[in-house]
Amino acid sequence: MKKLAVAAFGVLVLAGWSSLLLAAEPAVKIASKAGLGSYLVNEVGWTLYWYSKDSPGKSACEGPCLEKRPVFFRRSVTVSAGLVAADFGTLTRRDGTSQTTYRGYPLYYWANDLAGGDTKGQGVNDVWFVIDPAKFPPKPVL
């Protein structure tokens, strides 16, 4: 029983430390890459994408689309310098799950990005893109 209590305490301590470490790190930051420019990433550098078929407050990516494009969600979004926390929000998807938004648009990962800093989802099918905060949302072509 004593070993179980010690083990449980250890788990709680580790959980507490990891929560503190994650809380100290902004949930969304700006990264930069030559040839691509600035773009949004999560706290550990995984690239965030937007889908040009989405509209503010509504996701068009469902079913098989989500297998390649997992949603990004943080209950509370902290941001690094250069970003405004009020630009982030949450939408409720048709399946009842939550998704974080940037300036109203849903945020996603790309399943083929294998490490932080990867941007393999950029330009896929000419509808998936990284998000440059200075140029987002893009102006419609008239």
Locations of regions flagged by a protein language model:
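Bacterial N-terminal signal peptides that target proteins for export
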Residues: M1-F9
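Hydrophobic alpha-helical segments of integral membrane proteins
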Residues: F9-L20
